[in-house]
Each structure stands twice: as structure tokens, then as C-alpha cells.
């Protein structure tokens, strides 16, 4: 089947009014990725496929989001909302190019899996002309029923038109379809609008195809594959399902999640085997954690690379560009952004490291700050191998600290420090004996005078 050409038509023109949002519905996110992009990723998982995007409100934004993950796509605007078949025909120009297979999917079904779409395409390769993706919900009420006779799908009957006997059928229409390209335009053009709403319904092509003697069939997929998102509650439900899938996938691959339900991943999170993740950890986009790493509770990672046997947290934040080498450590209440942390280096507590390079085995004391921004530009801090930065030090970039250098606690470092040097950048302490007693007596007298005056 791999040599069969395919066009995937992604219907993404819905108004999404129930989302009550200025953002187009298909651009709302699950696991950090727009709904429509989840669908496109599933389509791409079936093999090589061109994508035709049918858009409406926010057309350019929708197209841009898809092209970020899929490269250039054809976009077609549905100027009037006259039904699902009408929406598909908005992509007539693309359909007419001639493809072996057509996939018709909805941009608001982010949980559809590539294997479900692949199963539909495989049916086409085996001789089917039209394949409808169906499912069996706990209660079929409200769904269109798939009517089968002799192993063939003969019609889709909506709930309000179904007989009492047909309403007993538990096999329901999931809305997604695959059809042989050579029949596509003829079937779509045969759909009429003789119904109460005067719309062109995609479901009608089943009866039309059956009437033409074509091979029409249905396949069953898990219920969650065809869940459509219409409001924020359903969006949250989809997020829950996606996260549970990801958690199970990772645990089965050798990752330990101590409290799985409290850990949240993004669409592209990569966690290698033998990583241990404690409760209440959040992964934003573009995070890769190598084998043997330990992520403590209440850590937040985004755009970060974590090396083998590294240790993060608790209460650590890794921002985009954080690159931690093997056995390095970023501890509690530390933030690392756009910085390379060398092998075995330690940033144990209460530090901000931004736009920096930390050498191997260096130790960054509590309260260390890389002062990287002057209000206009970012500057770099470079710390060599085996350096020691004393607590409560401020490193004012651009600045370079050499190998084995030692920075005294409380220093403000504004100039480069050579290798093996000791740098002190603070005012000398002055101690005045007995002065504290004098100050206490003075302030007590002032306070007493104020009380009398009241």
C-alpha cells in the first residue's frame, strides 16, 4: 500500500461558537499542540500524503499552524457553510489532481490515531471503494447509525430518522472516511441538499455509493479516536485522554512515574528508559530527558535537554535552551535558560543561570545570578571547568571565569577572572563594637516619644 498516493482533506472551517473564543476552534491546544496539528500528524503517520486544508475563520493562522509541522499545504476556503460534503468539495481542485486514496478527517478530532486511519487505507488497498470509520459508544443515543447488510455498509441513518429497530444498533458513525480517489468527485457531486437545512451531507455518499454497486464497508476504532471538541469541557476531557495515553506509553517503555496522574507531557516530549519522574512535574514543548535522569517534584521543563543521570529539582525551572550534560544537577528554586551545564556541574539551590556556559564539575553556590540583560541586549557568562562560585554572587555579563577559579561569596564580578585565580568583588566589612546598644536605645526613645504625643 505504501506506493498508493493519498490526499488527506482536513476539514477545519467550523465556526466553533461553543468554544466562546476569539481563537479558531482548531487552534485550541491539547498537549501544547493545536487540535488540527494532531490530526495532520495522524494523517502523516499513514505514509506519504498530501494535505488539503479546508479553512474558514482565521484561515491564515490555521494554515500557518499546520505548515509549521507539515510544510507547505494546499488551503481552500469554504466561504459558505452548506454542510460537510460542500466543505469537502471546497478542495475540488486538489481532488481533481487524481489520487489513489482520499482521507476525509476533521480538524477538531485530536485523538485520532494513525493506526486507525491506516486501517481504513488498507481496506481501500484490499478492494473497498469507500470506508467509514465507526465506533461503539456506551450509549449510541444521538449518533448516526451504520446500517450494514451482508457485510456491506448500505447507509448512515441519523438518530431522528432512525426506526426503533435501527436505534438498537450500537455501531455509530465516527464521521471520518476513506474513499478511492477515482470515485470521489462523482460521489460528492451526486450529494443533494433535499433536507430541512438545505445542506449537503457527506454521510449521503454511503447510500449513493451502495446504489452504484460500489464496495462500501466500515471499520471499528476505539471511541476516543473520534471524539470531537466543541467546548472547553470537551477540550479538557481530550487533554486527560491524551495525557493518560502518553503516561502509559512511557511507563511501558521503561519510565517510572511515581504518581502518573500528576505529571503532564507535551506532544513532543521524549523520555528515555530508566528515567524517574516524581509527582507534580510539567513538561512543555521540546524536552528530551536521557536515560537515568531523576526529575524531582514540582519542576517545570520547556525546550530543555537533560543528560544521562542528571538530577533536576525539586522546584526547578528549565527554560528553552537549557542543555544539561551527564550527571549535572539543577536543584531547588533554580532557573536555567539558554545555558549549557557541563558534566557533573552543580547548581544546587536558589540560582538564576541565563545565557551561560558552565564547565564540567563546577559548583555554583546558592543565590548566584548571571546578570545577562541590560534592558536592550543579552550577554554571555562563561565559567570554566572545576570553578567554584561562592554563594550570593552576581556575575555581570559579558564575563568569563577561568578553569579552577574561585569567586568569594557575596561578590559582584564585572571583569574576567583568570584560571586558578581568587576574585573578591565586595566592600570590606567594618565592625563597630557597642554601636548596636546605642542604636537600640536611640530608636526606643524615638518610639516612646511618638507614643506620648498620641
Curated annotation (Swiss-Prot):
<keyword id="KW-0548">Nucleotidyltransferase</keyword>
<dbReference type="Pfam" id="PF12804">
    <property type="entry name" value="NTP_transf_3"/>
</dbReference>
<dbReference type="InterPro" id="IPR005882">
    <property type="entry name" value="Bifunctional_GlmU"/>
</dbReference>
<keyword id="KW-0963">Cytoplasm</keyword>
<dbReference type="InterPro" id="IPR018357">
    <property type="entry name" value="Hexapep_transf_CS"/>
</dbReference>
<feature type="binding site">
    <location>
        <position position="230"/>
    </location>
    <ligand>
        <name>UDP-N-acetyl-alpha-D-glucosamine</name>
    </ligand>
</feature>
<feature type="region of interest" description="Linker">
    <location>
        <begin position="233"/>
        <end position="253"/>
    </location>
</feature>
<feature type="binding site">
    <location>
        <position position="366"/>
    </location>
    <ligand>
        <name>acetyl-CoA</name>
    </ligand>
</feature>
<dbReference type="InterPro" id="IPR001451">
    <property type="entry name" value="Hexapep"/>
</dbReference>
<feature type="binding site">
    <location>
        <begin position="372"/>
        <end position="373"/>
    </location>
    <ligand>
        <name>acetyl-CoA</name>
    </ligand>
</feature>
<keyword id="KW-0012">Acyltransferase</keyword>
<dbReference type="GO" id="GO:0008360">
    <property type="term" value="P:regulation of cell shape"/>
</dbReference>
<keyword id="KW-0677">Repeat</keyword>
<dbReference type="InterPro" id="IPR038009">
    <property type="entry name" value="GlmU_C_LbH"/>
</dbReference>
<feature type="binding site">
    <location>
        <position position="78"/>
    </location>
    <ligand>
        <name>UDP-N-acetyl-alpha-D-glucosamine</name>
    </ligand>
</feature>
<keyword id="KW-0460">Magnesium</keyword>
<feature type="binding site">
    <location>
        <position position="426"/>
    </location>
    <ligand>
        <name>acetyl-CoA</name>
    </ligand>
</feature>
<feature type="binding site">
    <location>
        <position position="409"/>
    </location>
    <ligand>
        <name>acetyl-CoA</name>
    </ligand>
</feature>
<feature type="region of interest" description="N-acetyltransferase">
    <location>
        <begin position="254"/>
        <end position="454"/>
    </location>
</feature>
<dbReference type="InterPro" id="IPR011004">
    <property type="entry name" value="Trimer_LpxA-like_sf"/>
</dbReference>
<feature type="binding site">
    <location>
        <position position="144"/>
    </location>
    <ligand>
        <name>UDP-N-acetyl-alpha-D-glucosamine</name>
    </ligand>
</feature>
<feature type="binding site">
    <location>
        <position position="363"/>
    </location>
    <ligand>
        <name>UDP-N-acetyl-alpha-D-glucosamine</name>
    </ligand>
</feature>
<feature type="binding site">
    <location>
        <position position="352"/>
    </location>
    <ligand>
        <name>UDP-N-acetyl-alpha-D-glucosamine</name>
    </ligand>
</feature>
<dbReference type="GO" id="GO:0000287">
    <property type="term" value="F:magnesium ion binding"/>
</dbReference>
<keyword id="KW-0573">Peptidoglycan synthesis</keyword>
<dbReference type="GO" id="GO:0071555">
    <property type="term" value="P:cell wall organization"/>
</dbReference>
<feature type="binding site">
    <location>
        <position position="230"/>
    </location>
    <ligand>
        <name>Mg(2+)</name>
    </ligand>
</feature>
<dbReference type="InterPro" id="IPR025877">
    <property type="entry name" value="MobA-like_NTP_Trfase"/>
</dbReference>
<feature type="binding site">
    <location>
        <position position="391"/>
    </location>
    <ligand>
        <name>acetyl-CoA</name>
    </ligand>
</feature>
<keyword id="KW-0808">Transferase</keyword>
<dbReference type="GO" id="GO:0009245">
    <property type="term" value="P:lipid A biosynthetic process"/>
</dbReference>
<keyword id="KW-0961">Cell wall biogenesis/degradation</keyword>
<dbReference type="Pfam" id="PF00132">
    <property type="entry name" value="Hexapep"/>
</dbReference>
<keyword id="KW-0133">Cell shape</keyword>
<comment type="function">
    <text>Catalyzes the last two sequential reactions in the de novo biosynthetic pathway for UDP-N-acetylglucosamine (UDP-GlcNAc). The C-terminal domain catalyzes the transfer of acetyl group from acetyl coenzyme A to glucosamine-1-phosphate (GlcN-1-P) to produce N-acetylglucosamine-1-phosphate (GlcNAc-1-P), which is converted into UDP-GlcNAc by the transfer of uridine 5-monophosphate (from uridine 5-triphosphate), a reaction catalyzed by the N-terminal domain.</text>
</comment>
<dbReference type="GO" id="GO:0003977">
    <property type="term" value="F:UDP-N-acetylglucosamine diphosphorylase activity"/>
</dbReference>
<dbReference type="InterPro" id="IPR050065">
    <property type="entry name" value="GlmU-like"/>
</dbReference>
<feature type="binding site">
    <location>
        <position position="108"/>
    </location>
    <ligand>
        <name>Mg(2+)</name>
    </ligand>
</feature>
<feature type="binding site">
    <location>
        <position position="25"/>
    </location>
    <ligand>
        <name>UDP-N-acetyl-alpha-D-glucosamine</name>
    </ligand>
</feature>
<dbReference type="GO" id="GO:0016020">
    <property type="term" value="C:membrane"/>
</dbReference>
<comment type="similarity">
    <text>In the N-terminal section; belongs to the N-acetylglucosamine-1-phosphate uridyltransferase family.</text>
</comment>
<feature type="binding site">
    <location>
        <position position="337"/>
    </location>
    <ligand>
        <name>UDP-N-acetyl-alpha-D-glucosamine</name>
    </ligand>
</feature>
Amino acid at each position: 500500500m505504501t506506493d498508493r498516493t493519498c490526499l488527506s482533506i482536513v476539514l477545519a472551517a467550523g465556526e466553533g461558537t461553543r468554544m466562546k473564543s476569539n481563537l479558531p476552534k482548531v487552534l485550541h491546544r491539547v498537549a501544547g499542540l493545536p487540535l488540527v496539528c494532531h490530526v495532520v500528524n495522524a494523517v502523516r503517520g499513514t505514509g506519504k500524503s498530501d494535505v488539503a486544508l479546508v479553512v474558514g475563520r482565521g484561515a491564515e493562522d490555521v494554515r500557518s499552524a499546520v505548515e509549521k509541522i507539515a510544510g507547505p499545504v494546499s488551503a481552500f476556503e469554504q466561504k459558505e457553510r452548506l454542510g460537510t460534503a460542500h466543505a469537502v468539495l471546497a478542495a475540488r481542485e486538489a481532488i481533481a489532481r487524481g489520487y489513489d486514496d482520499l482521507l476525509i478527517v476533521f480538524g477538531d478530532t485530536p485523538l485520532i490515531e494513525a493506526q486507525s486511519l491506516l486501517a481504513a487505507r488498507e481496506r481501500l488497498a484490499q478492494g473497498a471503494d469507500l470506508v467509514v470509520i465507526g465506533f461503539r459508544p456506551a450509549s449510541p443515543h444521538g449518533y448516526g447509525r451504520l446500517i450494514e447488510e451482508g457485510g456491506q455498509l448500505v447507509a448512515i441513518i441519523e438518530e431522528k430518522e432512525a426506526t426503533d429497530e435501527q436505534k438498537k444498533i450500537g455501531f455509530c458513525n465516527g464521521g471520518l472516511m476513506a474513499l478511492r480517489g477515482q470515485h470521489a468527485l462523482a460521489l460528492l457531486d451526486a450529494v443533494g441538499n433535499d433536507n430541512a437545512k438545505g445542506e449537503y451531507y457527506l454521510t449521503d455518499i454511503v447510500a449513493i455509493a451502495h446504489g452504484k454497486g460500489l464496495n462500501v464497508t466500515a471499520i471499528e476504532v476505539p471511541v476516543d479516536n473520534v471524539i470531537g471538541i466543541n467546548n472547553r469541557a470537551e477540550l479538557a476531557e481530550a487533554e486527560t485522554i491524551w495525557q493518560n495515553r502518553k503516561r502509559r506509553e512511557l511507563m511501558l517503555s521503561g519510565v517510572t512515574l511515581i504518581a502518573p496522574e500528576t505529571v503532564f507531557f507535551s506532544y513532543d516530549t521524549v523520555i528515555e528508559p530508566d528515567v524517574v519522574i516524581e509527582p507534580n512535574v510539567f513538561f512543555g514543548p521540546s524536552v528530551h530527558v536521557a536515560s537515568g535522569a531523576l526529575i524531582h517534584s514540582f519542576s517545570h521543563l520547556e525546550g530543555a535537554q537533560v543528560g544521562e543521570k542528571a538530577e533536576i529539582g525539586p522546584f526547578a525551572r528549565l527554560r528553552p535552551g537549557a542543555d544539561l550534560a551527564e550527571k549535572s544537577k539543577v536543584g531547588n528554586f533554580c532557573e536555567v535558560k539558554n545555558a549549557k551545564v557541563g558534566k557533573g556541574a552543580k547548581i544546587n539551590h536558589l540560582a538564576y543561570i541565563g545565557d551561560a556556559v558552565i564547565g564540567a564539575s563546577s559548583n555554583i553556590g546558592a543565590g548566584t545570578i548571571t546578570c545577562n540583560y541590560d534592558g536592550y541586549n543579552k550577554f554571555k557568562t562563561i565559567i570554566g571547568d572545576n570553578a567554584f562560585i561562592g554563594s550570593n554572587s552576581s556575575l555581570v555579563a559579558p564575563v568569563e571565569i577561568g578553569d579552577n577559579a574561585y569567586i568569594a561569596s557575596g561578590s559582584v564580578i564585572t571583569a574576567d577572572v583568570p584560571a586558578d585565580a581568587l576574585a573578591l568583588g565586595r566592600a570590606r566589612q567594618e565592625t563597630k563594637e557597642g554601636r548596636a546598644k546605642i542604636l537600640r536605645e536611640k530608636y526606643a526613645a524615638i518610639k516612646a516619644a511618638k507614643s506620648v504625643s498620641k
